[in-house]
Amino acid sequence: MGSPEKGPETAPVRLVPAVGRHRSPGHGPALVRAARRPRPAATEEYARAILSARPDGNLDDLDEQVAARLARQAILDRTSAPQLWCILDEGVLHRAIGGSKVMRSQLYRLAEVAENPKTTIQVIRSGGAHAGLLAHFVIADLDGKPPVVYLETAAEGHITDSSSAVAHVALSFDRIRAGAESWAVSRDLIRKVPEERWT
């Protein structure tokens, strides 16, 4: 059910994203995701370039979609902001979205978000296949409630609380995380790429 714009990012109150198996009780909400693009930290120009590539070519609501996507990021600035644990494919840092200026600003923004004490961003190198290439996903739950998985495809988004689906996606995340660079190495890489590639 749902659509790519109907996942946990659009419903932070109902699905304050958290993953019980990746946190200790009482640590508050957390957001754990694997992604092929830096959606939680997208700049306006980057979001606009991504959304402009929709296959239906319908740009009538582009401004509205961009504004909605940026508004969802406000959850990260709250005092009660969730813990964010995001694993990005290295290709995100090198794929030309919107041109050099857009990419440089986007990676500076990503580096800024990575400095937030509630945020962990790791980069997985592009040297081979990994489970994160199969789908964009978010694992989410509320304290005391069963975890929920949001899976996004090119056609739609799907939310499920199936225990088997949650277990499968959680295992995928663990495997992706095991192959990713450390937080410190990832941070330095995110800082370095704009100067080396997008000048």
Mark where each language-model region is.
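Short amphipathic recognition helices of helix-turn-helix/homeodomain-type DNA-binding modules
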Residues: 1-22
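Hydrophobic protein-protein interaction segments
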Residues: 18, 24-199
